Amino acid sequence: MDGNAAPLDEICKLAEKYDALVMVDECHSAGVLGKTGRGITELYNLRGQVDILTGTLGKAFGGAVGGFTTGRKEIIDMLRQRSRPYLFSNSLPPAVVGAGIETFKMLAESHELHDRLVANVEHFRAGMMAAGFDIKPTQSAICAVMLYDAKLSQDFAARLQDEGIFVTGFYYPVVPKGQARIRVQVSAGHTTEQLDRCIAAFVKIGKEMNVIK
């Protein structure tokens, strides 16, 4: 929920010690974390040392439906026979699969989108913090604007929509009590002008609602 990364290096050491397998869900990290956006395994220099990786095509890889699981051949062969979600689901549309493959190729051939995403996240965070908002530390594209009050987060999100900014307020039970926030997903597709417009809307409403001075 906060965009922070698990201590995967320590987890892998424990798995090796106790002869366990490691499965990592890269839904929020693939295309984002690591020097070239290859995910949390690249961030910790653990590529090839994780047994099972799962991910989604619904976030960095184009915003489509569906997802994927990858790993050693013997593991994937077993999952094809034993994984109930796989066995009892329909296949993805060919157009979705084709678009996903092309997105993988784009990210493998160029780091431009990843670098732009990193720059956009830094720009948004810096602008929001300079305005006086409480922003949780993050290693991803998720920027949590902390408001702490459930109703405030809902009202704030509604006012942002009035300003043409679509965000979602999160509150208990999605997050712990007293930890309500607005979660902003920054994209490589955002322009600097769009990010500045978003920051300006936050500042305007933040002052209206006495969140910032």
Task: Name these PLM-found stretches.
Residues 1-21, 152-153, 193:
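Active-site core of PLP-dependent enzymes with the aminotransferase class I/II
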Residues 1-2, 29-33, 86-87, 144, ...:
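Short, small-residue-enriched loops and turns at beta-alpha junctions
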Residues 162-165, 174-213:
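PLP-dependent enzyme catalytic core of the Aspartate aminotransferase-like
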Residues 110, 115-124, 129-164, 174, ...:
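Conserved PLP-binding catalytic core of the aspartate aminotransferase-like
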Residues 17-18, 131, 163, 209:
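Helix C-cap/helix->beta junction micro-motif
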Residues 61-128, 133-136:
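PLP-dependent aminotransferase class I/II
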Residues 36, 42-78:
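Active-site PLP attachment segment
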